[in-house]
């Protein structure tokens, strides 16, 4: 079974914004990772806000979320309203570093989906978070 990878906000923004100083490294990593990458609505919301001055990048991101083509680079994992309390528990568990909703949702999804690899630029926080196996996440790039 191929390794599944969660993607955080930073790489999405960097991939879609050629002026981002992480653009080249994130595009290179994207091509080396097994596809599709997995994410969730809180991450997309954060990325859209950060890309708000680049409407074409926002459109490209949103199109990638709804692509029905096999092998697309991004797949959104569903989050039900009933899972909000579990995400809140993640936020409480890591309250010392004040996690954002997107991070907490990814940590929760990592446990639910048994994924231990995260494509993120937020090494500081994701070095603290633990996978469902209670081990540090594998961080890419």
Each predicted region: which residue ranges?
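Short aromatic-hydrophobic micro-motifs that form the base-stacking/packing surface
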Residues: 119
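Metal-dependent nucleic-acid phosphoesterase active-site entry motif
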Residues: 1-20, 39
